[in-house]
Design a protein with these regions (language model features):
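Short N-terminal edge-element motif at the start of the domain
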Residues: 1-35, 42
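Short, surface-exposed, charged amphipathic helix/loop patches that serve as local interaction elements
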Residues: 34-196
Length: 196
């Protein structure tokens, strides 16, 4: 994965999380469209102010990814825009989930699922699912709401602390870049026991 990529608004985020029952899983998410930002600009702006209120960038990089989704939910509920067909839960969180895939080690190699199926099937428990979504909300807030001058530093610090990577790869190409999830068969020749 390239580490010298320019952090543009069309980058994808990838990271790994350790799950209680399924070991390490890999998350890959596409960026949300600008239209999502424009639809929920008031809620996102207020959430950004709450989550990024600290002047210490290290504090923001360490704590903000866990606070982003709960803060966004609280802001939207207070504004009356969380629930319903046009609400933030459907319009932003469900769209974020639609753009996010999970890879976990299965018997035949990496198995890929949309994040909502990984959650429904228990690959991501409730806490891990919420942690992943909150990290993705933080990433989106940083890319779309934050000023350009802070974006790169914030994402570099967060990625350093959390093992995040940013890529231009699609999910299939990202999976191909992962280490093999099944044991590789030995290719050493065995000595023949046939005599004569």
């Amino acid at each position: 994965m390239k580490t010298d990529l320019k952090l543009t608004r069309d980058l994808r985020i990838t990271f790994s999380v350790d799950t209680p029952d399924h070991g390490r899983v890999h998350v890959h998410s596409l960026p949300l469209a600008r239209s999502i930002f424009e639809t929920f600009v008031l809620e996102l702006g207020e959430t950004y102010s709450k989550v990024f209120g600290s002047y210490d960038p290290k504090h923001v990089a360490m704590t903000a990814p866990q606070m982003a989704l709960p803060a966004l939910r609280a802001v939207a509920k207070r504004m009356g825009t969380w629930d319903g067909a046009g609400g933030l839960e459907v319009g932003l969180i469900n769209e974020l989930a639609r753009l996010t895939n999970v890879a976990h080690a299965g018997p035949g190699g990496w198995e890929q699922l949309p994040i909502h199926l990984a959650h429904q099937r228990g690959i991501l428990d409730d806490d891990t699912h919420a942690e992943v979504l909150s990290s993705l909300v933080f990433f989106f807030l940083t890319l779309r709401v934050g000023p350009d001058v802070l974006r790169e530093d914030t994402l570099r610090m967060a990625s350093s602390a959390r093992g995040w990577q940013y890529t231009s790869l699609g999910f299939t190409e990202y999976l191909a870049s992962l280490p093999t999830s099944t044991p590789v068969a030995s290719t050493t020749k065995k000595r023949s026991s046939v005599i004569g």
